[in-house]
Amino acid sequence: MNKATWTSLYEVARKICWVLFLVCLPVTSFPFFPPALGGGALVRPLSLYPLIILFLIFTLPTILRKSLPMTLLSVLPFVLVAFASSLVALLHGFQPALGVSIAERMFRAWVTLGLGLAIYLTVSVMAHTPEGLRSSLRWLYVGFSAALLWGTLQAVYVINFSPQYFRLFSKMQRYISIRPLFNSRVSGMTYEPNWFAMQISFLLLPWLLGSVLTGYSVFRWRWRWLTIEWLLLGWAVAVMAFTFSRAGLISLILLILISLLFLRPAHNASPAKEKTHLRTWMRRLIEAGLAVAALVGFIYFAGSYSIFFSRLWSYWSDIKKNSLSGYFDYIGFGARFTYAETALRTYEAYPLFGVGIGNYAFTFDQMMPDQPVAAIPEVLRLLTPEVDRDQLITPKNLYLRLLSETGLSGMATFLAFLVALLGCIIFLWLSPHPEQKFWGKASLLGLISFLMGAFTFDSFAIPNMWVVFGLITSAAWIYRRPVESMPTANAQNVITEGHGEI
């Protein structure tokens, strides 16, 4: 075969692997993973399989031979600081926990961080043109359409439980996730309902809301102002309500509130009919209030089917002697507060470089606040040794993990990376072209979603944030090129602002 044939085959293989990567993103805990690829971990993204091929045949050659987005360099200081913190941690002499040595734990932690960085690098350099970005979003929507369909079918037994129906889907779920289904919550294709909710708020809502706000669509079909993104947004919100994820639903409400109040385009009114800023803000507040009230009402209706979720409001009627601390214990936040206080104490003891990536668990016993562990069953279970269990305690909060494991140096360099991403967003936002404005608004919502969601997760291996960061980097890089950043034939997918508003 000649060179042209090999090049053609290479491009076909690259595109197929990229499509598979995007479509497989909803599957986070795939049961068929060999130990060498993290078969004993909770986070087992199915997208890792096509990612390995992409990284070897495309990402690495691109890094070595071609120019790269300068934003990629902004993550390098954090990686160097994390590496330094790991080296310093070897000098502390931490004792093994649950039979796991510090060397083994650090290796696992660096594998997860390496996986996250590989996702970020690959997503950042995969698309070469605006059409490549649009195609990526379309395939992302395809994957999540399958996940939403699976979640919709799960919502049936949440609303009206049928043992036979539930057993059928439980059997099928075994081929998708390592964890069985919940009979009162929707978990999609993920490990648990909260993961599904955060997946939707990270990887789906920012782009859908950005499309609705700007009137831009990556699909050709539309009926007046109605687009595929409008339909997907309504579907995603409806399914997300049945996850009964407190963090996910709070994120949903805040994203919609921010979109309605601050990101809506202004009406094109004539000077004679132009309204004052006060009246405009009053109108927006009323509309946002009505939208949030309707959403909260729907969530309350859905929550009536879940004893777990209804605890958010049943405490004050069920418990006679109530208090704020008792309320947080009642809704299951006691363990989170223990993890958080322990992480802060660890940071105070090791302020500059922390205890090293993945080593939070080795100091947990010494840094834990003085309180009876028996009162917090979740903490007690994780501290008690069991046969064939080596799952160690983590902070369940990315900010606190960065502080406790990489210290002030790691937190500062990671925040600097986020500032670099914010610069990309501002560049896209200020562009006069509607398509770039879409990427600016959607990217801002993606960053906001991360900033909120980082309070509830701490894993570097979950693809959500790295995919969002990669799309932001890629969009800014592509539209900085003078030739390819010109308006394209997809301009017909932009409608007037008046029709594109929420």
Language-model segment annotations:
Residues 79-83, 114-122, 134-279, 300, ...:
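Alpha-helical transmembrane segments of multi-pass inner-membrane proteins
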Residues 149, 155-159, 243, 260-331, ...:
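A membrane-periplasm/extracellular boundary helix in multi-pass inner-membrane enzymes
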Residues 30-37, 174-189, 381-400:
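Juxtamembrane membrane-water interface segments that cap and precede transmembrane helices
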Residues 15, 22, 53-56, 252-260, ...:
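Transmembrane alpha-helices of multi-pass inner-membrane enzymes
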Residues 1-96, 100, 104, 128-134, ...:
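Transmembrane signal-anchor hairpin modules in multi-pass inner-membrane enzymes, especially those
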Residues 326-341, 349, 353-406:
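Long extracytoplasmic/lumenal interhelical loops at the membrane interface
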Residues 40-60, 107-118, 196-204, 250-257, ...:
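Membrane-embedded alpha-helical segments of multi-pass membrane proteins
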Residues 36-40, 190-194, 243-251, 394, ...:
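Membrane-interface catalytic loops of GT-C/OST-like multi-pass glycosylation enzymes that act
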